[in-house]
Amino acid sequence: KKSWPFHNHHVSEEMFLILDGEGILRYGKNNYPLKKNDIIACPTGDRSVAHQIINDSDGDLKYLALGTKNAFDICEYPDSDKILTRGTSENNSELWNISKGKESYDYFEGEE
C-alpha cells in the first residue's frame, strides 16, 4: 500500500513521524525498515532524495506528514519519468502541469 508515487521535490521539504505500525521507506536507491517513533526527513534535491513510504505489512501504518507549503514546486517521479510543476497565486488559484520525459519546446513554438 502506497499513499503516493516515488518522488522528489525541488522546492518543498517533507518530514514524517511514524505513529504506529511498520513499513518500508524507499529513499534514493535504498530501502529502510520503518517502525513506530521513527522520524524521516526528506530534503529538496534531485532523484537521489526521491522517497516513498510503503506499508508492506498486514496492519495499518499511521504517520504524520509535515511539509513546507511553498507557492511553487517541481516534483520528479523517477519510476514514470514524469515531472509535476505546481504554482499557487496570492489568491490561492493553482496551476498544475504534469509532463513526461525531458521533452522541451522553443519559447515561441505555437505562438506565431
Which residues fall in each region the model found?
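Conserved short histidine dyad/triad with adjacent acidic residue
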Residues: 1-9
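Short beta-strand His + acidic residue motifs that chelate non-heme Fe in jelly-roll/DSBH
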Residues: 25-26, 42-43, 49-57
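Short coil/loop residues immediately preceding or within conserved phosphate-binding loops
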Residues: 3, 13, 48
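Short acidic-glycine-tyrosine-enriched beta hairpin
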Residues: 15, 28-45
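Double-stranded beta-helix
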Residues: 54-112
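Short hydrophobic/aromatic patches on the structural cores and recognition surfaces of FHA
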Residues: 21, 37, 53
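Short, conserved beta-strand element in jelly-roll/cupin
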Residues: 9-26, 66-68
